[in-house]
Regions:
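Short loop/turn segments that flank or connect secondary-structure elements
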Residues: 1-254
């Protein structure tokens, strides 16, 4: 859907553009100082972590302001309600590296961390098995085949509570924040996914903003983080010592 440029829309675009532009300038300066293309590497991850987390919060808050500007433009009322969680059975992709970092930072001290990682591993294996099956069968779009069939498996996100609500709502990535439905949750299930009864939709950002996001994320390329949430969190676990070092840096600066 193409949104009408209301004053609220324009202000939200200016905000998110400014947040991304400032962060890119900061990362560009670090890269120049380091004499390399990417700003963030294992050598300065711990040192830069506080700024990364600060930026991620600003980015997600700006996106929420964008949602506030565009959702009222939809003719049908959004039917999403707390405790539904049906969309949380999809395999979450397109998670930015700085969001993975913030997400892992918020769960790393949880007593359920090991269980979370085991569940992430199981779901990642399930998705890639379906992807391989689609490629072996020479389907037209193996990724779409894998995503649809993964949803059919009914595997809830490891971070969904028994109540159906999100257990990490405040730090959920933008890929989770952009998913909505104009139909009740009873139609956001596998049997209705590809039918007219399901009117779920994704709120996309303008292409120019997506390009800015890509420019910021490019500075994390040396970390080699996957774009899927589950496999990304598994990869983040390898940076545990960097998080511990960042804590020491913060403590020493107080």
């Amino acid at each position: 859907m193409e949104y009408f440029p209301t004053p609220a829309y324009k202000r939200s675009i200016l905000l998110i553009r400014s947040v991304l532009s400032n962060e890119k300038a900061r990362l560009d300066a670090i890269a120049r100082e380091k004499g390399r293309k990417q700003a963030i590497g294992e050598d300065n991850f711990a040192e830069e972590l506080p700024k990364i987390l600060e930026f991620c919060d600003s980015y997600q808050n700006a996106f929420m302001r964008y949602l506030s500007a565009v959702l009222p433009q939809h003719s049908s009322k959004i039917q999403c309600k707390a405790g539904c969680g049906n969309c949380c059975h999809h395999f979450p992709m397109s998670v930015e590296p700085f969001e993975l970092i913030e997400f892992y930072g918020n769960i790393r001290k949880s007593p359920d961390l090991l269980s979370y990682l085991e569940d992430c591993h199981f779901r990642t294996k399930a998705y890639y098995a379906l992807l391989q099956k689609g490629m072996d069968a020479c389907v037209e779009d193996p990724e779409d085949y894998a995503l649809v069939n993964y949803f059919n498996k009914g595997l809830a996100c490891p971070f969904v509570l028994a109540s159906g609500s999100c257990g990490v709502y405040s730090t959920r990535p933008v890929t989770c924040r952009m998913y909505f439905s104009e139909t009740p949750g009873e139609f956001c299930v596998p049997e209705h996914l590809l039918t007219e009864k399901n009117r779920s939709f994704i709120v996309y950002l303008p292409d120019e903003i997506e390009e800015q996001i890509a420019d910021v994320s490019a500075h994390y390329a040396d970390l080699g983080l996957p774009e899927g949430l589950y496999e990304g969190l598994l990869a983040m676990n390898a940076f545990e010592s960097s998080f511990a070092n960042a804590e020491k840096i913060l403590e020493s600066s107080k």
